[in-house]
């Protein structure tokens, strides 16, 4: 409402100014102080001045609205930055203590969840759609603040994440992999081998929106980019969804072979070869962990994991 009123007042002031200006010009011509021939150029200058005045007032109103939005965004960013508890005596583990989160208070996506992800271990996170698998990764990364409970990590800057869909730029593969931190060509070539793209050249242009690549190749470039700048914790959210089974298994195996990194791997795919290599499989249902254990243990129990796997839901 304030912005609308500001715009209306500026229009009234501009119209009043132009009316007074025209009256003054008319009186000057009437009393012989101004030649009629100069009237049109003066009117044109007046119109341009009024137009610029209107633009300035409109921009001021726009700046006011942006300022309000910017203030709200900064508050949101500040709250997200304080979502997790960053501990100076961090021992490498990620601890979730009675964490609850929902986009609305009436429906919790994560419900009173407690778990400790131990440093260097590899965790598969499975479950049906909407069970909270991807949400828990976003909470750990600090995308959203937990409404209840604590999430203890060292710092979100020490967490890498690979999303289901990668975004790339109309540039060379080298620049797409390097981003803000430049790596050696040797390192970048190893990252391309990691995602089974050894034939790609670093100076090769990707094209606008990856037009020179297939969807699977775009995703693999995104994975290689994260591997090139790997942090202590690696979060993976359905990263092989667009890949064929053989390529997906190869990349999953290489991620599982990482020695020191803690890996949280959300997946819907059920490759026995890779699932057996995870230190622990967590089964999510309605925002809670309903089962956990090794592949062999969960298959032997014939519970929720067994059912999901046989139905092809993971």
Language model: regions and residue ranges:
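A hydrophobic transmembrane-helix motif
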Residues: 1-46
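Cytosolic ends of transmembrane helices, especially the final helix of ABC transmembrane type-1 domains
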Residues: 42-76
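The feature captures the beta-strand-to-loop junction immediately N-terminal to the Walker
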Residues: 126-128
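Helix-to-loop junction immediately C-terminal to a conserved catalytic motif
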Residues: 141
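Conserved "ABC signature" C-loop
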Residues: 166-208, 230, 304-307
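Catalytic Walker B motif of ABC-type/P-loop ATPase nucleotide-binding domains
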Residues: 234-238
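C-terminal portion of ABC ATPase nucleotide-binding domains
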Residues: 276-314
